[in-house]
Amino acid sequence: MLVAAAVAPRQRLCVAFSGGADSTTLLHLLARLRPRFGFDLCAAHVHHALSPNADAWLDFCARQCAALDVAFHPFREQVARDHPAGLEAAAREVRHAALSRVTCDWLVFGHHQDDQAETLLFRLLRGAGVRGAAAMAAIEPGFPGRLRPLLGVRRADIRAFAQAASLEWIEDESNADPRHARNFLRHHVFPLFGEAFPGAVPALARASGHFREADGLLGDLAALDYAACGGSPWLRDRLLMLSDERVRNLLRWRIRQMGCEAPARARLVEAVRQLRATHAPLYLPLGTAACCTYRDRLWLEPQRDGAPEQPLPWRQEPALCWGAGVVRFEPVTGAGIGRGALQRAMDVALVPRWPGLMLRQDSGRPLRSFKNLCQEAGIPAWLRPRLPVLRVDGEAAWIGEIGVAAEFRCGPGEAGLLLVWQR
């Protein structure tokens, strides 16, 4: 697997080291392979403070690493016992957060074939889709990437190897607690499976591989549909020519590409229903993302905070935060807002729109209402309350997505400031 992952000399591998049989075996194997491949090896241990033995486990892991000449990174963390998803989920989140702080090229885990089968069954019982049923990948490229070299090996075989090699490891007493869902499957369900279906674990692990292939194909289909619909923003009518299933697949794929969590299927079903039901502008929350439509366009964006309620005074800063975005004040010549006008003003601040807001875009033309300006600029109604307005001594000098008022526009050759709203 190290060859398949193209692990190169001097790359940094970090083992997620609990001290149990699986991660102990993995650490010893990698320590043996280190001279051959030339990678740097370290280990990270997360002290969850959940067991009275946690301090002893940390000391054990430190001694193991010292004996193997492996750099050791301990993390002492606190786990919320009132986590809504349960103690297991809380500990897992804390563990992943700690491991994310390790500087390395690859995080290496001791997950094995039994873990893969348990993960698949656990997720299916929770109603997982194709992505969830794909369970764990042996190689996940990234920064850092993730490797699971033992994913095709049975738990019993790892134990047998560890015993034959006279390795020492710890036993976490919580792994025997049937109140944890995965432990219940491990100790009560899978033994019954094994009696009736001796090949159940390898078969379930193979099935997860089939789901992973299917998930990849769905991603390929979504990429084709993404391009066929005009990219982002999409052409709304072209998107809605697709079947409901393909629209949901495309939305789910794009949301994940944005780094957001994909919403439940029911939420996507309702979103597609609303998209087909009306041509009116829409803002449809989809978990941490939102589906937006205006006129003939449709796009996705992360859900963002609204505009600040209080004015944000500007005191010559190069940028001011605005909701989840930022307004930048970039020095230019002959464009943007005249710098002199701002320096002479008594009160300069970013504010949200206010009732009766008017702005004149060109000299000799009448003042126009905020609503009319937004309509002409193609700004949907749901976005308008979030637009930043630069107020200068009580007057609107600039509105995000619309532009500068004629009275404040910089003249040719004059020092100006170009305001850029980054959402």
UniProtKB/Swiss-Prot annotation:
Key word Transport present: no
Membrane-crossing segments per the record: none
Keywords, sorted A to Z: ATP-binding, Cytoplasm, Ligase, Nucleotide-binding, tRNA processing
Intracellular or extracellular location(s): Cytoplasm
Catalytic activity: cytidine(34) in tRNA(Ile2) + L-lysine + ATP = lysidine(34) in tRNA(Ile2) + AMP + diphosphate + H(+)
Source species, domain of life: Bacteria
Disulfide-bond pairs as recorded: none
Xref: SUPFAM superfamilies: Adenine nucleotide alpha hydrolases-like (SSF52402), MesJ substrate recognition domain-like (SSF82829), PheT/TilS domain (SSF56037)
EC identifiers of the protein: 6.3.4.19
PANTHER family linked: TRNA(ILE)-LYSIDINE SYNTHASE-RELATED
Protein family: Belongs to the tRNA(Ile)-lysidine synthase family.
Entry domain remark: The N-terminal region contains the highly conserved SGGXDS motif, predicted to be a P-loop motif involved in ATP binding.
NCBIfam families named in the record: lysidine_TilS_N (TIGR02432)
Protein name listed in UniProt: tRNA(Ile)-lysidine synthase
The organism of origin for this protein: Aromatoleum aromaticum (strain DSM 19018 / LMG 30748 / EbN1)
